[in-house]
Amino acid sequence: MKKFYAAVGFLFLCLVLPAQAQKTPQGVMYDAQIVRVSDGDTIVIAAPFLPAPLKPELAVRIYGVDTPEKGHRAQCPQENERGLLASKFTNNAVAKSTKRQVVLYGWDKFGGRVLGDIVLDGQSLRGMLIQNGFAREYFGEAKQSWCN
């Protein structure tokens, strides 16, 4: 009987957790001072609340998207070109905006960046990247190649 309940519990987790992972988590929104755009889906914001000796900046990775890599991380010339375009799009969107906010969800799986979204004049950067073809939805599954 214990094995039965364990199997039912395991099956429940297998069905529920993937669905939960794709939902947008609850976050906290703050006004943001954007320091720089690292790439299409990573933006560095000022974080003066961090204690010394930490650098007063946080890298925010846009939750739920994958943009092409650029530079040495690109797998092919096409991905590098697309990565440069995604970065340019993000830079332009930030530069044109007058109200910048960040929604923070938590640390990414590696702990070096915070997962979140950037809201520019009331519009989600995540949505803008996907809508304009510079990003794909991504929730941890195997990534699709940008090289085809």
Regions found by a protein language model. Give the residues of each.
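Intrinsically disordered and other compositionally biased segments
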Residues: 6-7, 94
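Positively charged n-region of N-terminal signal peptides that target proteins for export
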Residues: 1-4
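Small beta-barrel nucleic-acid-binding modules, primarily SNase/OB-fold domains
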Residues: 17-148
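Bacterial N-terminal signal peptides
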Residues: 7-16
